[in-house]
Amino acid sequence: METYTGIPEELKFAVLERIQPTEPEREKLFAIQEELASQVKIAAEKLGIPGVLVKMVGSAARGTWLSGTHDIDVFISFPEETSRKDLETLGMAIAREVARYAEHAEDRHAEHPYLNITYKGFDVDLVPCFRVASASQIKSAVDRTPFHNDFVKPRIKGHEDEVLLLKQFMRGGGVYGSELKTQGFSGYLTELLVIRYGSFKNTIYAACSWKPGEKIDIMQHGEIEHEEPLVVIDPTDPRRNVAAALSLDKFCTFIDHCREFLKNPELSFFFPAPILPLEDSEILEKLESRKSTQLAVVFKTPDVVEDVLFPQLYKMEQAVAALLKEYDFTVIKTGVWSGNTETAVMMELISGTLPNVKKHIGPPVWVKVHAEKFKEKYQAADGVFGGYIENGKYIFEILRKYPTARGLLEDRLMSCSLGKQVHQSVNEGFEIIENAGICRLKEYDFRIYLRKWI
């Protein structure tokens, strides 16, 4: 059984010194929140829209935000009887009125539209929602968020630093963020873990023993079964698993991060050293040492938000791997990367080239009808090198249709399940890059990704 060391208090203090918001930061945040709330009210009055209330939600409203992060969630709530059409039309009208004072504005879409703005250096989401009586009566997914605020705020009071430590620890391990690109832990989930276990330290110790199917049910709802690796029943809505976005790999990465940290608690688990981009010479050295085949399918990045793009990229990744395996290529690993202009689906194969000949195994000779049909088909076929019997079965050595992975992908990629926007982009044009050709991709973030890849 593994023996873990304690977590030095001085280490926690050192981390908190770097992540606790300063008093000037707090004052600025509160001032911006008040400004935004006032502007929403003024906009509603100006547009003649009654019954609108403003609620600040998220980590900024709960005191669990990390220094240097400037995210504010402003919920523009409408009476429950408001129609969805009016919610979207009137809510966005108010948001756009507020956005007149912003440096930048961008329409975004979850279950319904909302507006993301940059306001005095803060990243602000202006989100219309229905004002319902309880989270069990929500009319759209965002309606439950104000109830999260009401549940967490009184219970987390006095434990805000524990949440900050857990968030930064998850960041250091690459598992923080519930967006579909990351598939990690959300801010709300980290808060619930601290509420459940009482502290950062207790959460870390508990996670060391987690297994897939781990269930946390703070309010003892226990009504619905979920199949995700970690199940954290939403205290405000017993039908929902707060950890539904967490992938198995990120779940296990967090467990491993906790175990390694407790063996040797260090600042680097919170603040890992920056990863440097891979230089061309290093790429060539790694290719030479690995002796495998690196392939990248490169195409123009679709103009959609990441939460739409990345599920499609992961779908493409799986489909391409399945295609390669179908044609006898051995896939070591796959991955995806997306930048502002180009996107790459990465594959590493044991070899990108196979022999021209393929051993095709037929039925046993004694299965007369099937065996004779098999023999007749391949005896008369073109591209057959010869037939014989081995272990009681007919064997024909036939010409392989795709001896190279590049040729296979160039010919069959569009037959894969790619997702709507990715399919459109790939259909407009794609490039297969192999081995040293990867040096063509110069984007800084890609070279950082590549260092982790190979």
From Swiss-Prot:
Catalytic activity: a tRNA precursor + 2 CTP + ATP = a tRNA with a 3' CCA end + 3 diphosphate; a tRNA with a 3' CCA end + 2 CTP + ATP = a tRNA with a 3' CCACCA end + 3 diphosphate
The protein's required cofactors: Mg(2+)
Gene Ontology molecular function, alphabetical: ATP binding; CCA tRNA nucleotidyltransferase activity; magnesium ion binding; tRNA binding
UniProt cross-references to CDD domains, sorted A to Z: NT_2-5OAS_ClassI-CCAase
Lineage top rank: taxon: Archaea
The protein's Enzyme Commission number: 2.7.7.72
InterPro entries, per database record: CAA_C, CCA-adding_arc, CCA_tRNA_nucleotrans_2, NT_2-5OAS_ClassI-CCAase, NT_sf, NuclTrfase_I-like_C, Polymerase_NTP_transf_dom, tRNA_NucTransf2
UniProt: Mg(2+) binding residues: 71, 73, 125
Entry binding sites for ATP: 59, 62, 148, 167, 176
One of the protein's GO biological processes: tRNA 3'-terminal CCA addition
Keywords (A to Z) from UniProt: ATP-binding, Magnesium, Metal-binding, Nucleotide-binding, Nucleotidyltransferase, RNA repair, RNA-binding, Transferase, tRNA processing
Residues given in the record as CTP binding sites: 59, 62, 148, 167, 176
The keyword Membrane is annotated on this UniProt entry: no
Subunit structure: Homodimer.
Family that this chain belongs to: Belongs to the tRNA nucleotidyltransferase/poly(A) polymerase family. Archaeal CCA-adding enzyme subfamily.
HAMAP family xrefs: CCA_arch
Function: Catalyzes the addition and repair of the essential 3'-terminal CCA sequence in tRNAs without using a nucleic acid template. Adds these three nucleotides in the order of C, C, and A to the tRNA nucleotide-73, using CTP and ATP as substrates and producing inorganic pyrophosphate. tRNA 3'-terminal CCA addition is required both for tRNA processing and repair. Also involved in tRNA surveillance by mediating tandem CCA addition to generate a CCACCA at the 3' terminus of unstable tRNAs. While stable tRNAs receive only 3'-terminal CCA, unstable tRNAs are marked with CCACCA and rapidly degraded.
More about this protein: A single active site specifically recognizes both ATP and CTP and is responsible for their addition.
The protein's name in its UniProt record: CCA-adding enzyme
Source species: Methanosarcina barkeri (strain Fusaro / DSM 804)
